Amino acid sequence: MSLWAHVYHGRFLSAEDRLQVINPCLTITGTIVHARSEADGDWHIQLDLDSEYRSLLNQANLEKQQGYLVLEPMCSNRVWQRDTIEEGVCDGFSQNTFTTDLIGHRVAATGAYVLDKQHGWTELHPVTSIVPIE
């Protein structure tokens, strides 16, 4: 089963309607500066991109994400958002690609590079891997 089956879609018809795929598989590098657990069970991670990847940011990343790219490993935490529970996207699935000890470390992250149409910023979502480098 594809990771897309576990992406929350909310008011959109499908996850692919909410997240416009720009590149289905992209690996980037940068430093994790912040992470928080979201109501839909995902991590919301802010990545300070290495200079060669800064062109991946758009105006919403600059204004709403302090100039960081968002990474969203899915179904990694307790889900308490009602529509996510009703969709059942995390039922029987847990993604363990991120731990908080990676905050402050340089990593390579791989996933689908998308435009989040709900928020307007770009992100990696779903994320397939986050590994420390150097």
Which residues are covered by each model-predicted region?
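OB-fold and OB-like single-stranded nucleic-acid-recognition modules
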Residues: M1-E134
